[in-house]
């Protein structure tokens, strides 16, 4: 017998205004996500820049306010300087995260153009696996500094006079994972993220940071990772990332539909850990969450 669900909404019991970025997404140079996904030159539905107009229209319809780029695991082997300048002069590189070849046809400028067409902001990730502070600062200077310096003038030379002004920056990706190129221990990463954030703020004090939390709650270092990383970075970052993916490998529909409860528990556990570090530091600052990877896999 079918049962009818009922929801009661009382506007007098509002909690807070919803940050529109909760509806954000991310894209990565993985499989056909970029090449043939959003970018397919020569296709009848592609625009003059090679981007699929039908995909752009769908993203606009979804009203995605912010998109994280370029990854994902991809960022740990991403050489941003290879992705700018004349396309025909860009080198091809072995892409080690997903074991493919990166031709750099879609680079920083191209993706920003796509994001503008889709009415989305760019949430830029820096490479803290195989590089570090200097590389992150150079990228920020290229993207956000007005001009008169090596990397801002290089951006201008590449045809982009005005700075991009990217506001939100991710300090690496899933650095707790042994699969990550340049994987770090919790304290190695915490110190690196702290010093990177401090240095980048000297270039652009207006930016905000997302620091890597655990790649999923089943990691053996889960919660300890958040504690140690935030103990280093709490005063310098604004968001802690959460990632999780759900599947139904056991073909159990009831269990699968209950995964939303598991996600709620995950969020509350992270909040408790953030509050613990806040108390430990005697801080008045609240740490916010960036749930920047979640889906059905």
Features from the language model and the residues they span:
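Long, well-ordered, tryptophan-enriched scaffold segments
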Residues: 217-218, 230, 236-258
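Non-catalytic accessory regions flanking glycosidase/transglycosidase catalytic cores in CAZymes
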Residues: 1-223, 231-238, 263-264, 268-297
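Active-site substrate-binding loop specific to GH73 endo-beta-N-acetylglucosaminidase modules
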Residues: 226
């Amino acid at each position: 017998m079918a049962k009818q669900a009922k929801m009661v909404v009382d506007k007098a019991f509002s909690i807070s205004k919803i940050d529109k970025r909760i509806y954000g997404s991310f894209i990565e140079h993985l499989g056909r996500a970029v090449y043939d996904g959003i970018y397919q030159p020569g296709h009848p539905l592609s625009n003059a820049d090679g981007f699929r107009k039908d995909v752009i229209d769908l993203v606009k319809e979804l009203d995605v306010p912010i998109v994280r780029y370029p990854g994902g695991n991809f960022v740990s082997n991403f050489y941003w300087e290879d992705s700018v300048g004349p396309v025909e002069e860009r080198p091809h590189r072995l892409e080690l995260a997903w074991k493919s070849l990166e031709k750099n046809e879609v680079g920083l400028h191209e993706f920003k153009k796509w994001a503008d067409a889709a009415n989305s902001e760019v949430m830029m990730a820096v490479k803290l696996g195989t590089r570090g502070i200097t590389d992150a600062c150079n990228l920020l200077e290229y993207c956000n500094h007005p001009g008169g310096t090596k990397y801002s003038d290089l951006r201008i030379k590449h045809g982009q006079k005005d700075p991009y002004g990217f506001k939100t920056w991710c300090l690496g990706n899933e650095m707790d994972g042994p699969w990550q190129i340049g994987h770090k221990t919790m304290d190695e990463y915490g110190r690196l993220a702290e010093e990177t954030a401090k240095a980048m703020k000297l270039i652009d004090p207006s930016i905000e940071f997302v620091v890597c939390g655990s790649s999923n709650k089943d990691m053996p270092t889960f919660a300890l990772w958040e504690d140690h990383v935030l103990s280093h970075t709490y005063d310098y970052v604004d968001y802690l990332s959460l990632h999780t993916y759900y599947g139904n490998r056991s073909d159990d529909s009831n269990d699968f539909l209950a995964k939303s409860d598991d996600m709620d528990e995950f969020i509350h556990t992270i909040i408790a850990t953030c509050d613990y570090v806040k108390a430990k530091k005697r801080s008045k600052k609240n740490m916010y969450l960036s749930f920047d990877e979640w889906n059905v896999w």
